[in-house]
A protein has these predicted regions:
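Cell-envelope and extracellular/periplasmic
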Residues: 1-160
């Protein structure tokens, strides 16, 4: 999901033809947190155009473009992603409690996210990215999400 339009196949053509003012994108900074955050620092919403689309999430852009064409409604893309992360940092507390095989994590959530010796929060620990990047948008009317777990939890698919 962190793959950008500029990295896509036929990127130059896509960028030149990206004239979709009803599609907007906001990029969330990588921000692990030890407690749920109330807001997201950002540069604001970017209107989809040849001068902005190169930095949009590619999967989000292509999906959003399809939805806009099919539904004729404005599309807001939230670039909330961090390549190479496991699922645990993105999972809310209720997610751990809902899966019996994750009871070992659910019982120790008060210990997470953990801080490193230098005081920073390890972005791969449970709750870290949920707290810093997902929790701030929970109150808003989000109609759907695209989730790609990738290979960071390879071999654990039956667990979740």
């Amino acid at each position: 999901m962190e793959w950008r339009v500029r990295q896509s196949k036929n990127a130059e053509e896509e960028i030149a033809n990206a004239k979709h003012p009803a599609i907007r994108h906001i990029k969330f900074p990588h921000r692990p947190a030890d407690n749920p955050q109330a807001d997201i620092p950002s540069d604001g919403w970017k209107v989809c155009g040849p001068d902005t689309v190169a930095e949009f999430t590619a999967v989000g852009y292509y999906f959003g473009r399809f939805l806009h064409k099919e539904l004729d409604v404005p599309i807001g893309l939230l670039g909330c992603n961090w390549g190479g992360t496991r699922i645990e940092p993105w999972t809310p507390p209720a997610g751990f409690r809902a899966v019996p095989k994750l009871a070992n994590i659910a019982g120790t959530l008060d210990q997470f996210p953990s801080r490193r010796g230098n005081g920073t929060i390890d972005h791969q620990t449970p709750l870290a990215l949920y707290n810093g990047m997902v929790a701030p948008v929970i109150p808003y009317g989000i109609r759907g999400a695209i989730w790609y777990q990738g290979e960071s939890n390879n071999g654990e698919g039956m667990l979740y």
